[in-house]
Amino acid sequence: MHTDIIIGDQFAANNNYWVMQSPELDYRHELMGRLHKIEPADVELEVLAAAAAAANNNNNTSSNNNHSSNSSSNNSNGSQTPNGNNNSSLATGGHQHHQFHHHLHHHHSHQHHHQHHHLHQHHSHSLQSGESGASEAWPHLPAPSYASDVPHAQQQQLQPAGSPNSNSNGAYGCAPLYDGAPYEVALGYGGAVVASTGGATSSDKEYLYETKNKEALYADPLDDPYQRPVLWDDITTSIQNIDPENALMLSSSGSSNNNGSSNSSSNTGESATSQLPQVKMEAIDESLLETFSTPLLSPLEIKTEKQQRQQQHQHQQQQQQQQQQQQQHQQQHQQQYQQQHYQQHYQQQHLYQHHPSLALPGLPPAVDVVELQLQQQHQQQQHLQHNNSSSSSPKLATPGDNSGNTSSYQQQYASQLVSGSGGGYLNGSSSNSYGYSWHSSQSFHTKYQIHPPSAAASATASATATPTAQLGAQQQQQQQQQQQLQQLCPPAAPSTPSTSSSSISSSSASSASRHMFVPPLTPPSSDPGSPGSSMVAAAAAAAAQRRTTPPPPYQQGHVMGLINPPPTLQLLGGAATGSNNSCTTTLTTLTPASAIQQQQQQPQQQQVPQQQPPPTPRSSGGGRRGRHSHHQPGTAAHIASLMSVRTVRYNRRNNPELEKRRIHHCDFVGCSKVYTKSSHLKAHQRIHTGEKPYTCQWPECEWRFARSDELTRHYRKHTGAKPFKCIVCERSFARSDHLALHMKRHLPKNK
């Protein structure tokens, strides 16, 4: 026994295995079956010489990869019409019931072409590469013979229900090499045994080498190495009940292909009808297709479905990306306007706090604040309504949300007027501000105290504030929080160019741009009853922190006065969007719980005010002269006041957010240091190891350091550089801690 392994277009001699491949269909699997090695003891072979009656006898067996030889199957198939199923197109026109193409080549050629033409018929037939037919050496075969001429596309769509052996484009045949007349291996379409083509009825043993391929119409998994579908008997019986026309085909295929025992008389009684086409064209209809587990699809339909799914998926992704871009654009737009308004508002606040004489001469300061804010509300509401009407994203703010922001914004200034008329506009201390009523407790604020407005002004202010102050108990709670906010950050008053000189405005503008740093207002690190001690303790750290990063270049504020969103959204350092919760979340940042949440954003928030100088027309004239105005003796008081505001924050030792991020532990025995960055841990471990990789490159200096900042500090001894300057006096220092100690001299003493 000798067979050939066919892989692609190449032959490999082997006597055990043969390989089938069908790469053109996505839902087909690569099949591999074991060919039964026929021994003389298993099957009695009767080889006849070439005779006139039996010149082309087909020897077909039903071993079927199950290691069972059917000794007497299909013995009486020759009694019917010769040339019934195999080589002649005259008996059955078109051979639509065939599936496999058996190409038996001459032993001198072994050619595998992509286009063959049948010698006896007029149909064309294409053989794809990778599916070349197996050919044996037939010394007496004059010309290649073909078992079927149906095109590939037609055969792919004509696969029947009961065919477990349908490999529509397979051109495979593994025929034994006999010394007698040539034998042709013909595989039946539905797995049925094919009658012989010889003219005489002989008792020759017929051997059928078939393959067990997974049918495309069945989605059941295979339960054994020989590719038998799960519950095959149940499926065939159910289909026989539904479609009795194909019952013959199903019974023959089930008996001769899928049963492991030897079926000696399965096809002898059906020899009269085995010549008929196994599957009729009208049998494949909708009623038959409904019984299958998977629909019958051609490869073209599968490809088009995949393309449609891919196009739909891409279209959905594009829509999602467009929506995200629109949302990001709107958020950036709102944040820009909030930052711009914050610059202008803080400048006005600083001017009005330290220079009350800059207000309008005829009106009290509180009334000016209300009128200015009403104008800003009107502009802001119009602009936000325009933005929301033009935006298509449903997640952005609506005009109703903006009206809620403006109403709470009006309540803020209404509450200021109520508290101001009661007991001093800025000097009325509140019990809810952590004990830090700075403007009433510090003695140096006497020259900047703001007197309460007159009776007429307070009446006008109360009349202005009454429509907005009657909105419910929840808004009264917001007013209390806003009062706390305004004690730490007083509102701004307008200053016009007609009433302010260039020197005063330039000095105030420069001081505002230099000292406008307002960090998130959080509970202080010391006892709430001792504001002076916490002020002194944090002044050094405040000055050092301001000096750690160089100030960025000043920005141009040409779009400053266009839109004015509420400044409360940015006063506390939160980048809020125009939603319903924007006012409530930012106005409640004075509570300890929310202050803890603000600590994670401190590094970014501390740099925001430095990038927001207030360029206005009244400060453009004397900006350069105003840089030196902080050397005046009167400005030391509001330097200390600004430092006192900056002290309300956590330090590095009691910040719970930093404790969560400290994940790098020192592994040395007895050391409990933990760091947030691995680079800090490496620098610390050099203390234990004694490593000092940073060497001073100054001539005749051999100092070495474990950290780069220590080397930088050491270089200043050689160069004499003193980059840390006092903002009050003209002294400079080479180290930031020395400047922090010096700043304590400028702080007022608490009595």
Swiss-Prot record:
InterPro entries with a match to the protein in the record: Znf_C2H2_sf, Znf_C2H2_type
Region (Disordered): 57-167, 248-275, 304-351, 374-410, 458-578, 594-639
Cell compartment(s), UniProt: Nucleus
Zinc finger feature spans (C2H2-type): 664-688, 694-718, 724-746
GO terms (BP aspect): negative regulation of microtubule depolymerization; negative regulation of transcription by RNA polymerase II; nervous system development; positive regulation of dendrite extension; positive regulation of dendrite morphogenesis; positive regulation of transcription by RNA polymerase II; regulation of transcription by RNA polymerase II
Biased composition range(s): Basic residues: 95-125
Comp. bias (Polar residues): 153-167, 400-410
Tissues with expression: Highly enriched in the peripheral nervous system but is absent from the central nervous system. Expressed in neurons with more than one dendrite including da neurons, bd neurons and the dmd1 neuron but undetectable in neurons with single dendrites such as external sensory organ neurons and chodonotal neurons.
Superkingdom of origin organism: Eukaryota
Any one Gene Ontology cellular component term annotated for this protein: nucleus
Record-linked Pfam families: zf-C2H2
Protein function: Transcriptional regulator which promotes dendrite growth by suppressing, either directly or indirectly, the expression of the microtubule-severing protein spas. Determines multipolar neuron morphology in postmitotic neurons by positively regulating the expression of genes involved in nuclear positioning including several dynein genes and the nuclear migration protein nudC.
Full protein name: Dendritic arbor reduction protein 1
The species this protein was found in: Drosophila melanogaster (Fruit fly)
